[in-house]
Amino acid sequence: MTRYVLGRIGQAVVVLWAAYTLTFAILYLLPSDPMELQLAAAGVQPDSLSAGQVAAIKHQFGLDQPIWLQYWHHLSGLLRGDFGTSLTQQVPVSDLLAQRIGPTLLLSVSAALVSLVAGSALAYLATFTRWTVLTRLPAVGASFPQFFIALFLIQFFSFQLGWFPATGGLVLPVITISVLASSVLAQVLIKSFEETLSQPYVVTARAKGLSRSAVHVRHAFRNAALPAMTILGVIVGLTVTSSIVVETVFTREGVGKLAQEAVLSQDVPVVLAVVTVAAAIFVLVNLVVDLLYPLLDPRIAVSGAAR
């Protein structure tokens, strides 16, 4: 069990490091110059500065250093809890995150809860009723791009019915994210339900005279939900990453919109901070699920100990 736990923690650290390093490499492979974008954001033309002034600005932000040294400075600062200073806004990145993370957490948590409830309910109803429409509905929901769902909801519920605001609201963004996340969860649960209902202990329970609902609730649901736990991390990842698109479409002042603005201006410290926080949330949830799974299914712990 100890080896299993240490292995999962080691994998989590590697994933975080890989996400950070890959993001850093992509940002520095972009053809644009971060300093020029920073000056443009301040309304200054780079051609109006002397070579000495340009060199001083690059030195101030460490842009004149070799790329490996810039990488090390960013990484060592992150390990100390220092995300650095925004190149375009000249404020600590941690302050920007603190200002924007509240709306994003509210959106992500709300969407995750709605997705869990809706996905589980849809999977149970589809399995219990065996209605073809319900069985195929998750595949339909997972096939639509989120920006299309967002624009459809705005057009119908905001412009035509006038029930919800087109920008800055919470209900429509939550629905937009939940359609995809709940559809993915429902697909996994339906497959798990079908496999569980064919197990010998379920057949025996039916032979003893238990009703279909009793068999589903007492025997099938708990065992079918165990494999679906592994997808909880994916659901959380979907809700976090989806916030970038959703907050942009609905003009919500959250971390997602901050990330979009930072990418467009090539604000490296901000982008690295957002990616690191998002990856940390994703990795942490998956790590918790991995550590809880052996407690709920002792076979995992036994197989891990055997190896």
Name each region found by the language model.
Residues 16-69, 162-170:
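Hydrophobic alpha-helical transmembrane segments of membrane transport/permease proteins
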Residues 48-80, 250-261:
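Short hydrophobic, aromatic-rich alpha-helical segments embedded in or entering the lipid bilayer
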Residues 54, 58-66, 82-86, 93, ...:
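Membrane-interfacial helix-loop-helix junctions in multi-pass membrane proteins
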Residues 62-120:
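An internal, D/E-rich "acidic patch" concept
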